[in-house]
Amino acid sequence: MKVLFIVQGEGRGHLTQAITMEELLRRNGHEVVEVLVGKSNSRCLPGFFNRSIQAPVKRFLSPNFLPTPANKRASLARSVAYNLTRLPVYLKSMHYIHRRIEESGAELVINFYELLTGMTYLFFRPSVPQISVGHQYLFLHRDFEFPGKNGFHLWLLRLFTRLTCIGAREKLALSFREMEDDEEAYVRVVPPLLRREVLSCEGTEGDYLHGYMVNSGFGENILHW
């Protein structure tokens, strides 16, 4: 089967998942014909992605979140205002995505949480079936419980997640925790996509802490802690 990837370029998680998925598909005799990655002025592809992915990589301009001045979370107001001014650019990107889906010879599209994939399937109705992959699709599972947070923000998060997977035949929710599939929501819970290098690593004792921060602004909090 010929597969086309569309990947949200914000952060590292979706890029890593795409690398692992390509390895998995190739081992099982399938072909990844192209990888389309969303980009913005603040994003550049990390070296590990360019070194690891084998299929041709192409870029398109896509929405991104602007941080607060403290760079600890996304600023909703700034992000909405900025992306509204760039709607004509994103429309061109949707035209491009649709053209690549139809011209690449792909028999399946795998979407890694890219908003413009959902918008392309909403407005252009590509003929190629789509599957959406990401841990965020667990938010749509009937049994998933959010921690106590602002209800409006959670509603927006679920709305954004639903927009990314418009047109998807199935949503693969990546999770370390085993859960039953939510057939009504077309959500299948599957293990996370981890790179082989991660599985082969061995921990060592030392005077250090190892962690991952989504926004660099949290570094100050860690230092104080």
What are these regions (language model features)?
Residues 174-178, 186-225:
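Active-site donor-nucleotide binding/catalytic segment of nucleotide-sugar enzymes
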Residues 9, 27-86:
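Conserved nucleotide-sugar phosphate-binding/catalytic loop shared by glycosyltransferases and other
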